[in-house]
Amino acid sequence: MRRSIDDHPFDPLQDPVVADDPDLTPVSWAIAIADDYDDAEPRVVLTVDEIGKPGEGLVAHLLPAEARRIRAALRDALREVGEAVE
């Protein structure tokens, strides 16, 4: 089983700071789930591609505990920058 959950193509209008800074790399990301591994355990699949280089990025195959850790880290980072978190 493979199923796409969400994706976000980079939009330079949403973040012109990243778009205009040659030292920053704009990326697109996608989240999916898959269970076609040798152990048949479902994993969260995070793909990050540099703009203009589709298929050349990194793909993380995360067990549920790893995905929860990233979720907690994102929540904490949002809190640190003053964003409301659920």
Label each PLM-derived region with a short phrase.
Residues 1-86:
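Positively charged, low-complexity terminal tracts
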